[in-house]
């Protein structure tokens, strides 16, 4: 039987436990380690160092701010949304209180809502806002943020010819005298206004071009638009005849309002007899709307508002039907007649149209012009086209003089019963 005292003596004689040093710990960790463990551990430490270095360069610190990793950032969208302006509401400035003072107030009218007295936005100068213009206001304080252009009907905006026509004065034949008259009225005031200022006279404002169909009235208007850098607006007379009462007059007002916003503008009314006919009472009131449109046009031509650098060209085949109030000086200062071309003019027109054709060299254009008496430029163009058709039928690549003679026999003589030139000459 073991004695209790002997057990206690043995426990006292045992040595105290010795703690493991780093070498022992490293030795214990080396048990069961493969041959590449040390290299893997070195690579992992290098990866940690590189990751910490990248984070320092990016300026990123691990925090609880909720910022996602850079791979999920979309800086372009964030920048766009930060600079995106809220939509504005369209209003009209009706009156300015304390004009020229720093604390000026503006009375605006928001359609179908109410009237407000507001101030200017931070990005707008007081000189940019005038009475009567449209403005854009924010939806919170209704402060004026931007000035807006005047409201113009889309159909009027579509009338403007953006590109210059490719017709020059060299492409117009038989109208030498008429071109000179047009250049005096349209080109000279726009290109050399100082000549009129020195003499103390106002330049002519409008021109009426009249004559039979096909004599080059519209062609000369296109050549004028090419020559000047002014905006060219072509209006067909029938476009201003609208169904509802007041629509045609409103389109005329919008047309001249758009023209005044340009530096210089040429308005060409083609077939003006559609709206400019003499006033009469037929008893049924069918032409009342057309007459209202013409009265608005007369008011715009010579009303209270100065027209500035707006030149008006009008073309018609029937000058005898126009209203006398439309033709008086001050509205249409010059009347230019486009008659039938003479022999030299017809030969020149033949040369112009044959320039772009593959023709033989021995064609006598003066002889062809003698065979086309009382012909317009449109008739001569039809002759050239028909001569090309004769060459195509004969499977030739060059148009000969015989083709022109056959075309003259077909167009000028056979189609004479369809020609209305003599009738229009009676009207003109």
UniProtKB/Swiss-Prot annotation:
Major site of localization recorded for this protein: cytoplasm
Record keyword DNA repair present: no
Compartments, record wording: Cytoplasm; Nucleus
A biological process from GO: ubiquitin-dependent protein catabolic process
PANTHER family: 26S PROTEASOME REGULATORY SUBUNIT
Assigned protein family: Belongs to the AAA ATPase family.
Described purpose of this protein according to its UniProt entry: The 26S proteasome is involved in the ATP-dependent degradation of ubiquitinated proteins. The regulatory (or ATPase) complex confers ATP dependency and substrate specificity to the 26S complex.
Protein name: 26S proteasome regulatory subunit 7
Source organism: Dictyostelium discoideum (Social amoeba)
